[in-house]
Amino acid sequence: MGRTTILFLFAAVCLAQAPTAEQSLSFKSPGTARISPDGTLVVYSVREADWEQNEFVSQLWIAPVSGGAPYQLTRGKSSAGNPRWSPDSKRIAFSTSRDGKGQIWLISPTGGEAVALTNEEASPGGFKWSPGGKRIAFTSAGPEPKELKDRKEKYGDFEIYQEDYRQSHLWVVDVPEEIPAASKHKPKAVAITSGKEFSVGGFDWSPDGTRIAFSASKSPLLIDGGTSDIYVVTVADKAVKKIVATAGPDSGPVWSPDGKQIAFSTANADPYFFYKNGRIGVVAAEGGPVQIVANEVDEDIGPAEWRKGGIYFSAWKNLENGIYKVTPGGRAVRLLASTGMSYMGGSLDETESKLAAVAAKPNAYPELYVVDLTASNPQPRKLTDFAAQYSKHNPANREVVRWKSKDGAEIEGILIKPADFDPSKKYPLLVVIHGGPTGIDTPLRSADGTYPIERFVAKGAVVLRPNYRGSAGYGEKFRSLNVRNLGVGDMWDVMSGVDYLISRGFVDETRMGSMGWSQGGYISAFLTTNTSRFKAISVGAGISDWMTYYVNTDITPFT
């Protein structure tokens, strides 16, 4: 059953002012935002639909912190992403495949022609500027081995499952003051790590630029993600030392400002980490005992930045994603809690006086904000106006609803209803179930993605998006409720939510449907064999047979 079946479950109601499906998909939305080290500009990505290429494309924009109109920085048919400011705020490195293969490019924040820095056979992955701004480190699988090239020429291009992977390693490239746009001769990158022992993931430069801390697992295969440990490599002589090795995954290292310690994400030696709280560990740069910080935050967390003021990170608290700060030995403090906003990441300027982030309040669209953290009562100041593109339309409203599941578990969800909602009327109900299971639905408005929610509502339906057991935002105990109960407990949560809305009197229970992707698809599939109350169910990328899933998946520990 597809989306067309779902759409015709109900009659068209009140189409005036509602965006069309094409308009809903065409609305622009902000993404990654990073403030310049000098605190004067913010670079951020904007996603929009390219109907000719049949895909979403993101480009980079600049917003002046002092105010003024934002301006577009990159253009073209290929997306530009992962912007990184040089330490002197004069250049931005970003990734794009505009020449056919993903490479690292450079551009001035004032505009002009972007130039490619790298010309690697294997596209670079993550990258970071060195503290002095003279070099950039990145991850890459490097050139294709000769034996693999010979095999392709002789037998064709195929892959031997779980054998033909290539380890990702650290590379460093010098950044010249100028790179002629037309030049095919790019600076030569040098491998800093090598071999078959590990595959590099996240990394961070030491403050003095002489070392790089990185995480690495046995291989790049998903099933080996739990083997990730923390290492330090000296750039000059390429000497590698493992400094953290626990039973669970350790990843995402960041250096302390004095270069003496490293913070990282850790499962705290727990191999059963899928539903457990990820913690922040701190270890001496030379290795030693690991100290766990911010243990009082009951959510899955990891360090984003370590500055003089402390370790900054984000964490969900119910339906809000907040920004926190903690110092080793201290308790975590939530910043900007009084603003009532949910922050999608964030970045700090060099002095920690300004914070830039994409954020939103309930029933509002995400916008780019900047906050003066030195103010007595810091408040976000909006730099963009994405909401203006919705001004001619009458978008649906979001309401947070709560109910008790079959076993007494407290469940939250988002009820999406027409702007002219009348509780005395009967509406068809569509249940849209997120994936994960550690995803989360919030009362924020957003441009339509997988499902045309605004069209569903414009056609006369109400939509329930349940945060069933296992969802993010409600702590480790809540996530553990579907352990050895997957599908069953989730179904209780969905159906008890449906019953709750029916009890409020505005749901036509003869016209109900369900849909979801991944874990949401699995729950929808589970509903097909456990209830006949839905007229239509759509299963997207959902597990329908655990036995075939186990023998085919590359993440067997999830089962």
State where each predicted segment sits:
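Residue-level detector of Asp-centered blade-edge/turn motifs that repeat once per structural unit
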Residues: P37-D38, P87-D88, P131-G132, P207-D208, ...
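Hydrophobic beta-strand positions that form the internal "hydrophobic ladder"
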Residues: G39-V42, I92-A93, L117, G133-I136, ...
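Beta-strand-rich domains and repeat architectures in extracellular enzymes and scaffolds
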Residues: E22-S58
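A flexible loop/linker signature enriched in serine peptidases of the S9 family
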Residues: V46-Q59, T74-G81, A93-W105, E113, ...
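A short helix->beta-strand "capping" segment at the edge of beta-propeller domains
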Residues: Q17-K28, P70, K184-T193
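Conserved beta-strand position repeated across blades of beta-propeller domains
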Residues: R34, R84, K128, D204, ...
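Short loop/turn segments that connect beta-strands within beta-propeller blades
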Residues: P64-G68, S108-G112, V175-E178, T234-K238, ...
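Serine-hydrolase catalytic core recognition
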Residues: M344-T559
